């Protein structure tokens, strides 16, 4: 399993780190119609998805066919989506990277009015020899609700010492 490499800190497996980092960088730079081929960055049984859902269960797309279909849907529903302020963080495992970024673009999700979304994201990438085995995406679900025109509930935080 790629996640089980023994760690020698950040100075081990340098070529593997470089190769995996290049894949993560390419994923985060992929825009427009190029997203229709983004599934090619994954292993044949790789998966990607959102870990912020109303069910509490991740929404996962596994395998090239499902990831390709997701790419088509994303291109239709978020036609000009771009990641920016991208910061990639290596870990002591050369096959695992974290990314912090902002995302923005038009929303054209069926069943909701056209809108615009800006949100902050955390991405986890697990890789095997330059191919993504798992990509997990985390974001602020309240910003997603706002972008879709869904009323956001007010959370009472009485007594919390926030400024």
UniProtKB/Swiss-Prot annotation:
Key words of the record: Antibiotic biosynthesis, Virulence
Pfam families reported for this sequence: PHZA_PHZB
Biological process per Gene Ontology, one example term: antibiotic biosynthetic process
Keyword Amino-acid biosynthesis part of the UniProt annotation: no
Keyword flag Oxidoreductase: no
Organism superkingdom: Bacteria
Entry's family note: Belongs to the PhzA/PhzB family.
Job description of the protein: Involved in the biosynthesis of the antibiotic, phenazine, a nitrogen-containing heterocyclic molecule having important roles in virulence, competition and biological control.
Protein name (database record): Phenazine biosynthesis protein PhzA
Lineage: Bacteria, Pseudomonadati, Pseudomonadota, Gammaproteobacteria, Pseudomonadales
Record gene name: phzA
